[in-house]
Amino acid sequence: MSKLELKIPPLIQILIFGSLMWLIDFITPSIPTSSMIVGLSSTFILILGCLFALKGVLDFRTNKTTVDPTNPNKSSSLVDHGIYNYSRNPMYVGFFLWLIAWGLFLSNGFALLVAFLFPVYMTKFQIVPEERTLEELFGQDYVVYKGKVRRWI
């Protein structure tokens, strides 16, 4: 197990990535864009991200299982329905969409590229360790679920 696995909660990761994006925007040139198109696009993507994340949390709450990303061994049930029919990690998809919306809002291609490092980081240090734990907890049911539903979308 790597020292970073399951250590930094995803919401803190969003703040780190978002801050890095802002810093990059501050030190590199932005792309001239139509503020209306950028505003509408980033707002739509942000709302979509909120819906993904919220539905993921609500499905966990409905099934009375933990949403604590640093302690997946507290999971009490395998949630494989609702939005989890389409993604094994809808909350993280939502968070990724938030970062894309932020990158679009900043109108900076370099900053937007940083958003695409988020799923790489999350897969290595959050999702893969979670999957190991869930496979231990739920066995073949989780293996079958992994075979049917994609990790991201």
What are these regions (language model features)?
Residues 1-81, 93-153:
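Membrane-anchoring alpha-helices and their flanking helix-loop junctions
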Residues 86-93:
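Histidine-centered phosphotransfer motif of kinases
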